Amino acid sequence: MRIGILTIFPDFVKVIKEYGVIAQAVENNLLQIDIFNLRDFTTDKHKVVDDYAYGGGPGMVMKPEPFFKFFEYYNQMFGKPYVVLTSPQGKTLNNEIAKKLSAQERLLIICGRYEGIDERVMKFVDEEISIGDYVLTGGELPAMVITDVVSRFIPGVVEEESVKNDSFYNDLLDHPHYTRPRNIDGLEVPEVLLSGNHEEIELWRRKESLRKTISKRPDLFLKHQFDEVDKKALLLLFKELIKDAK
């Protein structure tokens, strides 16, 4: 998969491909990340990418010409990409959106800045995506988040089992995790995790995953499609809750 990020601050976003599993994926040719500087597609000596808004109002608007020149270049060089604009007006990023984006051969993320982008640039945009109901100074951080989330669904970037166990993968939050030592400050690792009984461990993990989801994200719990393991885990959880309530 090829992911491109179009920004006026390339040094800001280049770190996304320099660390961790994404850097390994790039090194192993599982993922190609291209970072483009929008200023390289300007025609004036000052490389200006913004201008005053028609009709007045505060702030500046990103000019359309550099975008038109960029997409002419990109389409000739690589082929037409699936284009995402980072925007507080967009759909909120989630696992389903990330999985869909990971199936694209070429993904291009535009980092918005200033008051916004000239509306005529929207002819190139397939989808607007937000990472939450708040406003940032620019789209670089959301672009990095989108890149990170999408990359996890590319085969080989992380182990498939790790992805399946992530929070939200099946509309459930992740179960608790423990490592050594077995005891710290009187806090013990649950005995079931030391038992070696993989069936009981899986059941305990699912139970705790359901407990977390009910407590923290009941909206996800209500969307979840329950399997037989879920039903057994819920029965255990309800028994524990009834016992604790007495």
Curated annotation (Swiss-Prot):
Pfam families from the UniProt entry: tRNA_m1G_MT (PF01746)
The Gene Ontology CC terms held by the record are: cytosol
Name where it's found: Cytoplasm
Q: Name the top EC class.
A: transferase
Q: What is its main location?
A: cytoplasm
List the GO molecular function terms.
tRNA (guanine(37)-N1)-methyltransferase activity
Question: Out of the domains of life, which is the source?
Answer: Bacteria
The reactions it catalyses are:
guanosine(37) in tRNA + S-adenosyl-L-methionine = N(1)-methylguanosine(37) in tRNA + S-adenosyl-L-homocysteine + H(+)
Name the job this protein performs.
Specifically methylates guanosine-37 in various tRNAs.
User: How is the subunit organization of this protein annotated in UniProt?
Assistant: Homodimer.
Entry protein name: tRNA (guanine-N(1)-)-methyltransferase
- Organism of provenance: Fervidobacterium nodosum (strain ATCC 35602 / DSM 5306 / Rt17-B1)
Recall the taxonomic lineage recorded for the source organism.
Bacteria, Thermotogati, Thermotogota, Thermotogae, Thermotogales
